[in-house]
């Protein structure tokens, strides 16, 4: 987590730890750490900052929030990044007053992904997940002009995303 303070807002960049697939109980190995510690602490950090001024946070949150945020939701329900617990923690972010900038503008957009496995030519077939986000404090949501997924940019299993504010 890197937090930068600007005159009118805080910008927080984050890599959220992957819950990792599966232990002997067929559940992600670090799911409890991810959902009961990391996600809780990260949201508390953002809310503490927000007490002073609005917050923008961005990065790899390692969760596909909705079924439309990945190609194959049904077979992935128990996999890291799409468990009920991880999705519920993203719900908590929204309930705490943060806005998923992409979904605010494109609530029904499908096949818009920011990550593709290196296996089985997933990227060329657009079999992916939307794991990367720009979330903003509710106070900033009217200023969202666009939220972009730059899926034509190569060089990683993730692609860049961008947020344009008025």
Predicted regions and their residues:
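Active-site regions of metal-assisted phosphoester/phosphodiester hydrolases
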Residues: 1-166
């Amino acid at each position: 987590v890197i937090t930068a303070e600007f005159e009118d807002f805080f910008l927080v960049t984050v890599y959220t730890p992957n819950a990792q697939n599966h232990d002997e109980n067929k559940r992600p190995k670090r799911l409890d750490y991810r959902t009961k510690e990391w996600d809780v602490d990260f949201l508390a950090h953002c809310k503490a900052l927000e007490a002073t001024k609005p917050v923008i946070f961005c990065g790899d949150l390692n969760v596909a929030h909705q079924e439309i945020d990945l190609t194959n939701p049904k077979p992935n329900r128990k996999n890291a990044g799409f468990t009920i617990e991880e999705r519920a923690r993203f719900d908590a972010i929204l309930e705490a007053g943060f806005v998923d900038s992409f979904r605010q503008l494109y609530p029904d957009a499908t096949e818009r992904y920011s990550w593709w496995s290196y296996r089985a030519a997933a990227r060329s077939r657009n079999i992916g997940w939307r794991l990367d986000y720009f979330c903003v404090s509710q106070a900033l949501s009217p200023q969202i002009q666009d939220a972009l997924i730059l899926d034509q940019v190569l060089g990683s299993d993730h692609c860049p995303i961008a947020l344009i504010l008025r």
